[in-house]
Amino acid sequence: MAKQSMKARDVKRVKLAEKFYTKRVELKKIISDVNASDEDRWDAVLKLQTLPRDSSPSRQRNRCRQTGRPHGVLRKFGLSRIKVREAAMRGEIPGLKKASW
């Protein structure tokens, strides 16, 4: 089990990313615009740097919904590989069965 503080930190990052999403997209659009003046682009870079670090979506971590485990998380289920296996063995995931060949 992950610490509660780590889970809370990830929740905070998700909220910040949602809050600053539009502003971040607008600034990145200005920065990548070739027709914009150098001053405008530089101002956009500086404004982007003033945004909170945790507002960047790349700082979010996929975590298991049940345990909070950060590694081995399957996106399709939102669970770690361990919890997916346990649920599959109990027959709780429809259409998922153990491989046999």
Swiss-Prot record:
The entry assigns this protein to a family as follows:
Belongs to the universal ribosomal protein uS14 family.
Cited Gene3D superfamilies = 1.10.287.1480
> Could you tell me the keywords of this UniProt record?
Ribonucleoprotein, Ribosomal protein, RNA-binding, rRNA-binding
Name the SUPFAM superfamilies on file: Glucocorticoid receptor-like (DNA-binding domain)
Instruction: Specify whether Ubl conjugation is a keyword of the entry.
Output: no
Say if the entry is tagged with keyword Cell division: no
**The protein's name in its UniProt record:** Small ribosomal subunit protein uS14
InterPro entries associated with the record: Ribosomal_uS14, Ribosomal_uS14_bac/plastid, Ribosomal_uS14_CS
> Which GO terms of type biological process are on file?
translation
Subunit (UniProt): Part of the 30S ribosomal subunit. Contacts proteins S3 and S10.
Q: What is one cellular component GO term in this UniProt entry?
A: small ribosomal subunit
- What's the superkingdom here? Bacteria
Its annotated function is as follows: Binds 16S rRNA, required for the assembly of 30S particles and may also be responsible for determining the conformation of the 16S rRNA at the A site.
| PROSITE patterns for this protein | RIBOSOMAL_S14
For this UniProt entry, the molecular function terms from Gene Ontology, in alphabetical order, are: rRNA binding; structural constituent of ribosome
Q: Name one Pfam family in it.
A: Ribosomal_S14
